[in-house]
Structure formats: structure tokens, C-alpha cells
């Protein structure tokens, strides 16, 4: 997958204020407020910035944390990660591998088979429902 690079000014023009704050500035939406927190529609969640596929609904589960949670991405190559020491703690930030959009964080307290919990902002995602036929 080719890397997609745009300036912050271009992203600011392309995205809503909320998406820009979360995806490009590393913000976080309020818990239990996101569009996809409680949805159970079958499909694939894509990056809201570049449309890269990130998570399948088959890997989504209710972690009770207030954000959509997944136990694995569609492919390991879909995401990148880096250490995040903000807010006086250490976490692992998760980003879209194609455009470096901030998605959320990954924690080692998820269910089998991976034991991981990808805690993702709804604003960084777009759900493409599976076709009925």
C-alpha cells in the first residue's frame, strides 16, 4: 500500500473539525459518544481519511470502555503504532499505516484469540456494510 501524505492545511480542508482534531491532531472523542460505539452492522471499517480497510466487524466486541473495540485489524500491515506518553501515562498509539491518521490505542487486555483491545475513535472510521447478497 502506497503511503498517502498531505499537509495539515490540506487535511484541515478535507475533514470536519472533529475528524481533523482526532485524526490529525491525536485527539479523543468522549466515551460512549461515537457513531460506531454500539453498532453491530456487519462490514469493514475503513480509515476516515484515506479509505484504507482497517477492522472487520467480525473482530468487533463490546469492551465496555466507551469506544469501538476490536481484537485484531484486517491485516497487521493496516496499522502502525508508536509509544504515547501523553497524560502522564504510557500507552501504544495506533495509526493508519497508509496516511498516519490517529485511530486510538491498543491495550493488552482484550479477548482471545489475540488478547488485544484496539480502542478506536469512531471519528477515525467509516463503516462500509457488507452486501446483503
UniProtKB/Swiss-Prot annotation:
Keywords, sorted A to Z: Metal-binding, Oxidoreductase, Zinc
Chain positions recorded as Zn(2+) binding sites: 47, 50, 96, 99
EC number: 1.8.4.12
MF-aspect GO terms: peptide-methionine (R)-S-oxide reductase activity; zinc ion binding
Ranges of residues in domain MsrB: 8-130
Requisite cofactors: Zn(2+)
Cofactor descriptive note: Binds 1 zinc ion per subunit. The zinc ion is important for the structural integrity of the protein.
Gene Ontology cellular-component terms listed: cytoplasm
Any Pfam family: SelR
EC primary class: oxidoreductase
Catalytic activity, as annotated: L-methionyl-[protein] + [thioredoxin]-disulfide + H2O = L-methionyl-(R)-S-oxide-[protein] + [thioredoxin]-dithiol
Ranges that cross the membrane: none
GO biological process, one term: protein repair
Active site: 119 (nucleophile)
Domain of life of the native organism: Bacteria
Family of this protein: Belongs to the MsrB Met sulfoxide reductase family.
PANTHER family: METHIONINE SULFOXIDE REDUCTASE, METHIONINE-R-SULFOXIDE REDUCTASE B1
Family matches, as NCBIfam families: peptide-methionine (R)-S-oxide reductase MsrB
Protein's UniProt name: Peptide methionine sulfoxide reductase MsrB
Organismal lineage: Bacteria, Pseudomonadati, Pseudomonadota, Gammaproteobacteria, Pseudomonadales
Amino acid at each position: 500500500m502506497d503511503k498517502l501524505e498531505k499537509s495539515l492545511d490540506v487535511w484541515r480542508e478535507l475533514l470536519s473539525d472533529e475528524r481533523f482534531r482526532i485524526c490529525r491532531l491525536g485527539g479523543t472523542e468522549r466515551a460512549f459518544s461515537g457513531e460506531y460505539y454500539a453498532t453491530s452492522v456487519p462490514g469493514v471499517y475503513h480509515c476516515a481519511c484515506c479509505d484504507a480497510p482497517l477492522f472487520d466487524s467480525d473482530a468487533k466486541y463490546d469492551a465496555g470502555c466507551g469506544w469501538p473495540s476490536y481484537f485484531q485489524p484486517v491485516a497487521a500491515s493496516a496499522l502502525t503504532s508508536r509509544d504515547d506518553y501523553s497524560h502522564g501515562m504510557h500507552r501504544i498509539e495506533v495509526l493508519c499505516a497508509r496516511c498516519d491518521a490517529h485511530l486510538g490505542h491498543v491495550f493488552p487486555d482484550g479477548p482471545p484469540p489475540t488478547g488485544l483491545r484496539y480502542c478506536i475513535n469512531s471519528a477515525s472510521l467509516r463503516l462500509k456494510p457488507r452486501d446483503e447478497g
